[in-house]
UniProtKB/Swiss-Prot annotation:
Descriptive protein name: Ribosome maturation factor RimM
Coiled coil: none
Gene name per UniProt: rimM
A GO cellular-component term linked to this record: ribosome
Pfam families the record matches: PRC_RimM (PF24986), RimM (PF01782)
Primary localisation category: cytoplasm
Keyword Lipid biosynthesis annotated: no
Signal peptide segment: none
Family indicated by similarity: Belongs to the RimM family.
Organism this protein belongs to: Rubrobacter xylanophilus (strain DSM 9941 / JCM 11954 / NBRC 16129 / PRD-1)
Residue ranges constituting the PRC barrel domain according to the UniProt record: 92-162
Alphabetic keyword roster: Chaperone, Cytoplasm, Ribosome biogenesis, rRNA processing
Recorded GO MF terms: ribosome binding
């Protein structure tokens, strides 16, 4: 990742769109960093976002140096990365999905369930993957299942879904 000291994924290119180099991007989180003027690292180089618009299926983004569908198709699967220092400061009670990895997952009584080892998006919401003594636990990242997150304390209160 070269020039990024603390890279954070802001989105992933899922497909080309049209013939003029536009790419479809699945945002990480709400996608507030997918906006004109920012220059994420994409495919090994910085590419300025020339235009970004939200759609029901994610975002459509025009990137500098991607003039046609063929170049756009070559970027399928590439992450858009910014250094953490380039991100907007989170609002109060907000955090980045990347900040969830490494948190201790505890139940409502404070009992250890394991560690959040990764997250992944689904059409409905992010899912936390918690590794504990009993194996992997997949937890929808919703208020119902994760009522409290405290990155400073390094923990998240988790209500695992009923089997």
């Amino acid at each position: 990742m070269g020039e990024l000291a603390d890279p954070v994924v802001i989105g992933t290119i899922t497909a080309p769109h049209g013939v003029r180099g536009t790419v479809r991007v699945r945002p990480a989180g709400e996608g507030r960093h997918l906006r004109e003027g920012l220059s994420p690292l994409v495919g090994g180089r910085r590419r300025r976002i020339l235009r970004a618009r939200r759609t029901p299926k994610g975002f459509l983004v025009d990137l500098e140096g991607v003039p046609d569908r063929f170049r756009a198709a070559e970027l399928r699967g590439e992450d858009l990365l910014l250094d953490r220092s380039e991100l907007d400061a989170p609002e109060e009670d907000e955090f980045y999905v990347a900040d969830l990895v490494g948190l201790e997952a505890v139940d409502e009584r404070g009992g250890a369930l394991g560690e959040v080892i990764e997250t992944f998006p689904t059409p409905a919401h992010e899912v936390l993957v918690v590794r504990g003594e009993g194996g992997l636990l997949y937890v929808p990242f919703t208020r119902e299942h994760v009522p409290e997150v405290d990155p400073r304390a390094g923990r998240a209160v988790v209500r695992p879904p009923e089997e």
